[in-house]
Amino acid sequence: MVLKLICFILFFFYSLNVSSRNDLNEVEREKVFKVTALTKNFSKAERSEALSGGAGTVKKFGKNAFSQHFNNLSFEQRQDFLIGNGFFRKVWIASPASTTASDGLGPLYNARACQSCHIKDGRGHLPREEKPLSAVLKVGNYNNINLIPHKVYGKQLQFFAIPGLLSEGSLSINFKNSNFMKKNLNKVFLKYPNYKLNKLNYGPIETSASLSLRISPQVIGVGLLDAIESSDIINKEDKNDNNKDGISGIVRLVTDNKGNKKVGRFGVRASTPNLFVQTGTAFMHDMGLSNSVGVNAFGDCTNDQKKCYKFPNGVNKNSSHEVSDEVMEKIVFYLSSLSPPKRRNVSDKDVLYGKKIFY
């Protein structure tokens, strides 16, 4: 996933038509053009090629490599980064509680903290137990590319519930081995997951419903994607493959939390316009916490789950939602400031050969 993210960013910026940017002056345009121009020399790495996050790229590796901020943040920005990190790691609890700033979890939920799914800001894994901790199972039916929530189970199956309420079910996975022959006649074995729903506590799910297991992605570099000018994305639309490069792309326009049409950037089907909406959606659907994006204090509970609405929520007289915009903005800043680590082995001959194929 890291490689895919870096490749997308590199390909996107290397193919920009900077002449269409009216926010750049001539000097800036020329500078951007030189930096993003496609290379024709694949015998050696380009200057600064190892800097996946530009001038702010961090050079730390190891188990905390994905949790580093851009190294060109100011002192004040680093303070905001640490505050956002605290909220990202914060463990939420059910209402009512003496810590009113941390209650409101559920009633149905899949995680109690952002960090639970994005462990050390990295990628999740396929479930090893019946209740996934870093994956969600989307359920419903698709109308073209839009997911229509399931009448009973909502947008995703919730594997946990607060005391006094049944969770929606559990999941078991077994793996089948598949193999294919490489050109050098060596067999490569891959594991193919088959998952099964167990203990559905609110009735069966019809076979016509779509089920999609999603592993939580790592969150490094998302600020770079969020920072791309919408006009640059729109100018690269080529739905009829007019440039004959074999790639047809269509920009997806979605509605943000304020009712405005925006370019879709995040999610499997580019369903989310920015990190603020992405964060708010995750709070409501994954943890059952209301905010200005997802306003239901009962999260993904549906009208058919009447008992779900009998539990207290975390909205109090001093707030209109369980998660304030201030908390959301700190988390968004934290996510936006996570730097991809420095690329390694950029001068390796196999890496350069792969780069040539990619170009």
Locate each region found by the language model.
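Sec-dependent signal peptide recognition
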Residues: V2-I9
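Periplasmic c-type cytochrome electron-transfer domains
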Residues: V18-Y359
